[in-house]
Amino acid sequence: EFTHEEMPNRVRMTTSCCQINCGGQGDIAINVQYVKPPKINHDLVANVCERPAVVARCPVAAIRPAMVNGKPSLEVDEKKCICCGACYPPCPPMQINGPDSTKLAIWVGGKHSNARSKPTFHKLVAANLPNNPPRWPEVADIVKRILHAYKEDGRAWERLGEWIERIGWPRFFEMTDLAFTRHQIDDWRGARSSLNAS
């Protein structure tokens, strides 16, 4: 359906295994979203993980050292855990990935280059989508809606994020028929200049 370059500009799609998104900023990013804290294999933690590094890696201080069955291990405070997945790379026995603990999220409008406008971070447009491999029909449907709207309304050489900035986020959600929820509100204190306020 979108095999020929008939779009206003090239669309860069990225995927990432977590919301940390080391894949970078893409026009459309499909990221795994974890919904449950990691399950810890206490038998392997002492031999595989550098525990102080794992504790330091957690952005919300939800991981602490512990002794389990007489072996050094780790424990997770499930009330603090934000399920970001930052603990898994330095400690594979802290398995966070699984069919019952992952969903998908779609972010749009990211850009690394400074051509025509400054580099931008992408923004969340759909969250908690079911992880239904191998075709991911719910994700494919939303990506197609975004691409159709962009193809119809985008100007020549205008990147996806530039198109959204031109038409505005409310119009983008109307054109793509996506639900705007509280998760899309940019309420970070340092982002006051980007808030949609009068």
Residue positions per predicted region:
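Peripheral terminal and linker regions in Fe-S/redox and tRNA-modifying enzymes
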Residues: 1-198
